[in-house]
Amino acid sequence: MDSFDAPDRYVSFKGIDCEGNSRRIIDRLHMHIDDPAKTNAFWERFRAKLAIAEDPLKRQADGLCLLCANIYYIADLFEEHDDEDGLAMLRQLEDECC
């Protein structure tokens, strides 16, 4: 895909699967924060916020909003655990959806 064919969120979100991209990152994030050796108080609280985000009647922010608001913390977690695939997905999400 050349630069003219690449999705551009500033023009339109058409063709950008922000919901799917955020879901994949949330799944990837759980791979780390569900491991007791990798989690801490911040990630425990974040996991609780993700659970609330799944419930449209309770949520104040959806999963995409939580990811975008915490992108640097998530990047640090992925870097700390050498998760290059997670970082690539996160960069794509930030470029296309945040």
From Swiss-Prot:
It comes from the Bacteria. The keyword DNA-binding does not apply. Belongs to the CowN family. Keywords: Nitrogen fixation. The keyword Lipid metabolism does not apply. Is required to sustain N(2)-dependent growth in the presence of low levels of carbon monoxide (CO). Probably acts by protecting the N(2) fixation ability of the nitrogenase complex, which is inactivated in the presence of CO. Pfam families: CowN. GO terms for biological process: nitrogen fixation. This is N(2)-fixation sustaining protein CowN.
